[in-house]
Amino acid sequence: MTLIYRKLSLPVLLLFLTLNTQAQQAPRPDDFSRWETAISAFEKADQAAPPAQGGILFIGSSTILLWKTLAADFPGYPVINRGFGGSQIVDATHFADRIVIPYRPRQVFLRSGGNDINAGKSAAQVFADFKDFVARVHAKLPATEVVFIGLCPTIARWKQAETNRELNRLVSEFAQRTRHVKYIETYNMSFDESGRPRSDIFIKDMLHFNAEGYRLLTTLVRPHLSR
């Protein structure tokens, strides 16, 4: 590993590798091989310091990957961060046997779906992918609670706001009728009084949260963590 890589934290390194791979070659849909570097890095980290069984797993795309304050935001909770930037729900499902099931978590918080919609999937398609993820987890961990952290609009992807809302609705209704599935509403957290997304909770790309964005997200997620 080069010197520059040694200086990067694991989340930043994974995001760098992901973006670098995507820049070199636009992958075909469901080309899971593009995530092998990120998943292998997680497995190596697990070998060096195995997470405790029965913890609280956070998985998903860049919102999870870049949540660098996750452990500090939830003191006293055994949280595990397994976000990989640019990923879709199908990717989390595909790699569940490697970065979900081995931890036997009591809860799995999934924040994903935005990249799916940005890639052209409908809310119904993303919802179907979410149900597949739940089925994969519950096939081996039937008592594990799967918690979907709902999507909220961003300035960079404002045109997808209604699709985000529709996906949230589908997941929310599914959670109400499905055991060990929960939904967290976040849609309104990014709106100002005029009904437009707040610019003060995003970094310059107007897509990813800054510290204030994560502070707000933390307040919405915290009540749903299980002791």
What are these regions (language model features)?
Residues 49-52, 73-74, 101-103, 139-141, ...:
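Extracellular/periplasmic catalytic domains that process cell-envelope and extracellular macromolecules
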Residues 1-58, 64, 68, 72-73, ...:
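N-terminal secretory targeting modules
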Residues 64-80, 89-127, 147, 151-155:
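Oxyanion-hole/transition-state-stabilizing segment in secreted/luminal serine hydrolases
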Residues 49, 98, 115, 131-136, ...:
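Extracellular glycan-modifying ectodomains
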Residues 45, 95-102, 136-137, 224:
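A generic secondary-structure signal
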